[in-house]
Amino acid sequence: LPELYELENDIEREQFLRAYALTYLKEEIWGEQFVRNLDPFRSFLSVAAQMNGKLINFTGIGRDVGVDTKTVQSYYQILTDTLVGTLIEPHHRSIRKRQRQAPKFYFFDTGIQRALSDTLDQPVKPTSYQYGNVFEHFIVNEVVKLNAYQRHPFSLSYMRTEDDVEIDLLLERGGKVLWALEIKSTDQVQAKHVRHLKQLGKDLGAHRLICISRDNSVKQIDGVLCHHWRTGLDLIFSDKHGKLDPGLELHEVVDLK
């Protein structure tokens, strides 16, 4: 959210993010009468924020919130329709099998997700598991944003095998996987970080394999391109509409305490 950069301190930023979330509830959802009963939807937002970037268990969320599975599905549809986030579907060449697997949902802004999950007061340390989640969330949002500017946008999906091996993002056009993307928050990419990407990407017939991270060095490990996240995204979205905002820094997103 651009408004955050104009605020002077973290307290003001936290207050803004919480107020934004409440305004969304009042004006976008209740005001437009997307839902008749706001209480379960409010509970759903909290759970959805906690589940950000994870496989969606519609039945489990419904049980926690007190609504049925179809209602949870309609809630997620409301979020996508109001541009509050993006559903990333699982990859499978069979549409029928794809529909049997669970999608992931990413809120459009890491700060809003943290406000809704009530974690704004928890510091995000670079070595923590939470930092890895926030970094992945940040990169996915950048990919979604840059992809929207493309004349011929990619179809975005993720891949997860039965033994829980995963590729974070697949970028497809014309039924072909042009990029298989692994997101790592490390500042020192090693062979262990790209092992699964190498194998699964090869099985998929992906044209290019890339790992983007906080590592400033450009290298190639076992056929996998390894780039800093900024240059990596510039490489993927290399046309004139795909340039990153030069003023954008990750610390501006996650260092809100």
Could you tell me what each predicted segment is?
Residues 172, 177-188:
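Active-site ExK catalytic segment of metal-dependent nucleases
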Residues 215-257:
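Domain-level recognition of nuclease-like catalytic cores that cleave nucleotide substrates
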Residues 109, 160, 184, 213-215, ...:
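Residues at the C-termini of beta-strands that transition into short coil/loop
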Residues 185-227:
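Catalytic cores of nucleic-acid endonucleases
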Residues 3-177:
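Accessory nucleic acid-recognition modules appended to NTPase machines
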Residues 117-119, 182, 192-193, 222, ...:
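Short conserved micro-motifs at the rims of enzyme active sites and ligand-binding pockets
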